Amino acid sequence: MPLTKVYLERENMIKFICYPKCTTCQRAKKWLDDNKIEYELRDIKLDNPTLEELTEWYNKSGLPLKKFFNTSGLLYKSLDLKNKLPEMTEEEMLKLLVTDGMLVKRPLLIGDDLVLVGFKETEWKDISQQN
């Protein structure tokens, strides 16, 4: 299922950051489309989040930084991050995340007052009521 619909970036538009080959991202995209929620699509493999973006999203989310790591990914496992992350500072973790989009948990849904990491329909339902 190709990800083809891309809306022009507008101020206040929700950013949908995904990896198009990821089935969870495909389900999340379908959910956004089915709920008629406009978004700007960004391929995390081609356009990895910057340090500034990740820092802002992390601070806005209220989530532990570990939640931003794709713990089921091959790169995460090959780098043995399960054992290394507990010893790392937040700054070190953020700098590591920006090195490769495949380390970042996806999809990400980013809005003015919104940061959702991963796709859980129950958490995403609130945004469909705002649009």
Q: Which residues make up each language-model segment?
A:
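Thiol/selenol-based redox catalytic cores and closely related redox-interacting motifs
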Residues: L46-I127, N131
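Short, well-ordered coil/turn elements that cap or connect secondary structure elements
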Residues: E11, D34-K36, L63
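Short glycine/proline-enriched coil/turn segments at helix->beta-strand junctions
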Residues: K36-E38, D112-D113
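Class I S-adenosyl-L-methionine
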Residues: Q26-K29, D33, K77, K125
